[in-house]
Amino acid sequence: SNTKQPTPLGGVIFA
């Protein structure tokens, strides 16, 4: 499943 995680760079990653 894909979950949105906040990144230190100010974006989001789908992992």
Curated annotation (Swiss-Prot):
* Cellular component terms per the entry's GO annotation: cytoplasm
Q: What is its EC number?
A: 3.5.1.5
GO function term, MF aspect, one: urease activity
Q: Does the keyword Membrane apply?
A: no
Q: Which GO terms describe its biological process?
A: urea catabolic process
Which EC class, in a word?
hydrolase
Key words, A-Z: Cytoplasm, Hydrolase
Q: Which reaction does it catalyse?
A: urea + 2 H2O + H(+) = hydrogencarbonate + 2 NH4(+)
Its main subcellular localisation, reduced to a broad class, is cytoplasm
List the subcellular locations. Answer: Cytoplasm
Q: In what pathway does it function?
A: Nitrogen metabolism; urea degradation; CO(2) and NH(3) from urea (urease route): step 1/1
Superkingdom per UniProt: Bacteria
Q: How does it assemble?
A: Heterotrimer of UreA (gamma), UreB (beta) and UreC (alpha) subunits. Three heterotrimers associate to form the active enzyme.
Q: Which family does the similarity line name?
A: Belongs to the urease beta subunit family.
Q: What is this protein called?
A: Urease subunit beta
Q: What gene is behind this protein?
A: ureB
